[in-house]
Amino acid sequence: MIKINFNWRTFYLLTIVFRFVFTLSDSYIHPDEHFQSLEVLTNRILNYSTNIPWEFQDDPARSLAPLYFIYGPLLYFIKFFKLNLTALQIWYIARLQISILSWIITDFCLYWMLPSKPERIKAIFFTSTSYITLVYQNHLFSNSIETLLLLVTILLIDDLRYVQESKDQDVQNLNKNKNLFYTGVLISLGIFNRITFPAFLILPGWFVMKYVLKHYVSGLYLVMGFFSTTALLILVDTILFGNINNVVAEPFNVSSYIIAPLNNLLYNARYENLAQHGIHPYYTHILVNMPQILGPGLIFFVSKSYTKTTPFLTVISGLLFLSVIPHQELRFLIPLLPLACCSFDFTLKWVQPWMLYTWYIFNIFMSILMGKLHQGGVVPVLDHIKSEASVQVWWRTYTPPSWILGSNSTETTHLGEKLNDNKFINIVDCMGADSKEVQQILQTISTNKPVYLITPIASFKHFDESRFSPVWNYTFHLDLDHLDFADIQPGLGVYQLL
């Protein structure tokens, strides 16, 4: 059993400082944090030349509406006032925005959801000290938005549960129509943000169903909230994707409208489509991803004391139903972190005081690894060489987000594709190709612009050093996908082809 003795306010304030430190760090966790956010919006609003992913092209499988609601005001503000900001500065501001939103909404929901001060302090403290909150939640993932939508939805559902289980007749008679309307709104927003959002709500949704079965009229408010929001989001997407003329011509033809979640569902329902993004064993979320999220916190989570609570049921719901889908990435589970922290139990007799320190060590290590080092040189390198016309050959890095260049004349190609030399900057994304293929590409590039090879310093040994001149390097970069324990030197280098 652990008795937590600390000045929690001091720790809490310290985590706020760390949150902003990691928000302004340059790590790059997954391509989707760029390619499903500002890579798309800066092209549409600021006219940047970017690499638009397939999800936002023909038959779009991603909704633009949530992105415009979250990041649109910032970008339109910059455009309207003609602010002379670099793309890197815009990135920092957008991340600060999501960081502050996360901080306010998460703490608010946990405070009002939990029944006592010790429970509130526990949940907020462990949520705030987790590397998921300090790092992942401050990146521009759709999962970061999903966390906030889920917390508010669960707060509303838990309130409905409280009304039903209260022994106070006055509480039972409270009108919760607004609550149900907002729940419908949030479910719709959650689905348009990520199609898997309902997976988190299947088990806690039982309390909504119980309430509606006793209050039939209230069910209409839930339906109205959901369908009115859905109709609005479909209309917004239809306008943004340029299909409004089809709607005017054929308003009763469903195919005239852009229904992004439906397109996403149809795409992901095909196994061969999921296989392009990676197939994982069905146990990956439960045995790999959740332990990686909680770390030593998994010890505190295994308890019978909280199994009937709404946060615990939400965690189990998300774990079970997302595990049915064979494509399983860690970030899909990050909305569960705050709710799992609500269910930590320190009253267990076998839990020892030293176990608490393993939580600190684990989260400090993971925060530095994922918040500073992981692919940490990609964005700084793009920012460093953005002002020079060039051909950039990237190897063994994540796909460089071209919007960081802040240019309206950029093109991204892959191995074997022809370069358009009229562009100011050409990016050749070689991903993890064989080094011989990269060498061949370097030999065949015909241009008057300087040609740069950008690769982890540890990987440069695959090339003839005499053919290159080192230009610049960024130390805080670690490539976990191509680790060579014989040479684990960190850093991302820029080498000019001679």
UniProtKB/Swiss-Prot annotation:
Location within or outside the cell: Endoplasmic reticulum membrane
An individual GO BP term: GPI anchor biosynthetic process
EC category name: transferase
Pfam families: Glyco_transf_22
GO molecular function: alpha-1,2-mannosyltransferase activity
Pathway(s) of this molecule: Glycolipid biosynthesis; glycosylphosphatidylinositol-anchor biosynthesis
Coiled-coil features, chain-numbered ranges: none
Glycosylation sites: N47, N84, N408, N473
Primary role: Alpha-1,2-mannosyltransferase involved in glycosylphosphatidylinositol-anchor biosynthesis. Transfers a fourth mannose to trimannosyl-GPIs during GPI precursor assembly. The presence of a fourth mannose in GPI is essential in fungi.
Note: May be used as a target for the development of some new fungicide, due the fact the presence of a fourth mannose in GPI-anchor proteins is essential for viability in fungi but not in mammals.
Annotated protein name in UniProt: GPI mannosyltransferase 4
Underlying gene: SMP3
